[in-house]
Amino acid sequence: MTTYQKIIPIANQILKKYDLCDHCLGRLFTKQLYLSSNKLLGKKLKKNSKSSQRCYICKNLFDNLNYFLNMMIDSASHYSYSSFSVGATIKPSIIDRDDVIRSKYKLKGIDGIKTDVTKELGKLFSKKTKKSFDSLDPEIVFTVNLKDEFCDIRSKSLTLSGRYVKPVRGFLQKQKSCSNCSGKGCRICDFHGIKEFDSVEGEISQFLFKKLGGTTAKFTWIGGEDKSSLILGTGRPFFVKIQNPHKRKLRAKSANLEHIKVSNFKIVADSPKKPLKFNSSVEARISTSSIIDAKLLRKLKNLTKKPIAVYEKSGKRSEKRILSIKYKKSDETSFTLFFKFEGGLPVKRFVTGDDVSPGISQILDMSCKCLEFDFHDVEVK
């Protein structure tokens, strides 16, 4: 006796007691027969059984899937994508009735009705749009609520890298988060997590929101800077992840924004999982509490001979190396320092010697203060 012949009596028992649509009946047995179409199998099993009543399990939900398909198409009309997946929310009573049938007739290892609904919606959407169904890494994800009749859509985040030059002083690197949602995104900040765009982060975010759409932008900075610092040369590298973007391609490789210039825009797989190692070349203008001379300044050369210990308030200790150092005396109580160092060295604290050893004040044996410092290069190792 074939497997098909074995399931016919069970199917007939079910149909005597319950009216089932082709989809719901076929789903109970397709896996046993290694078939792909629930509807065709259900139709075959019901060839001698006719009924005009509503399906006991789904209440003829499958006859109405085109309504939800059109809802999906409308939701996706503003998105660029090549792959998708579908999730669904259905009435608990439908799932309960499905469980009753499967339990009563000991039908194990079969798809639940929720799985079948999402599969059917996926097939219909793929056929209509020619997009690929991808359950592992889709570019957009639909959540179709068949209970309350609405469709939610989310797109896969998009990560970009780039570099920015900041030729003006008095411009912050980081943007203050929205006070209402603490950066999570709300109606007040248009779900961006920030209400203003008056920083490096703000200007880049605003540019990308206009080009790509999206909600929040999460930055990974390769080093930080003072509000008064200039970022020169090829600029400071950064990574930014855009949540729920509408577009997935950025034609612009550079942008001249109001206060900064961005270059080398490119889409990357993801932001770095671990902090990247980098070197910074800085020009710092330093004032001293006492008169300095060339002989005293020569002591600064010793800073390249051993690591600089940096102590944080948390108790963490790290070591940074000064790779090269030059100086130029400005007047009796000030000089300019040109030095290259491993990323993570706090420049102002290095000058004053505040929890940094040895610091410039310690080397010169006098109180020193960093008036301002500018970055000439940030080199990722």
Swiss-Prot record:
What functional role does this protein have? Answer: Responsible for synthesis of pseudouridine from uracil-54 and uracil-55 in the psi GC loop of transfer RNAs.
The species this protein was found in: Nitrosopumilus maritimus (strain SCM1)
| Alphabetical list of PANTHER family matching this protein | TRNA PSEUDOURIDINE SYNTHASE PUS10 (PTHR21568:SF0)
Picking any one GO molecular function of the record gives: tRNA pseudouridine(55) synthase activity
Q: Which UniProt keywords apply?
A: Isomerase, RNA-binding, tRNA processing
For this chain, the family text in UniProt reads: Belongs to the pseudouridine synthase Pus10 family.
EC no.?
A: 5.4.99.25
Asked if the record carries the keyword tRNA processing, the reply is yes
Q: What class of enzyme is it?
A: isomerase
Q: Which GO terms describe its biological process?
A: tRNA pseudouridine synthesis
Reaction catalysed by this enzyme? uridine(54) in tRNA = pseudouridine(54) in tRNA; uridine(55) in tRNA = pseudouridine(55) in tRNA
| Name of the protein described by the UniProt record | tRNA pseudouridine synthase Pus10
List, from the UniProt record, the residues annotated as the active site of this protein: 226
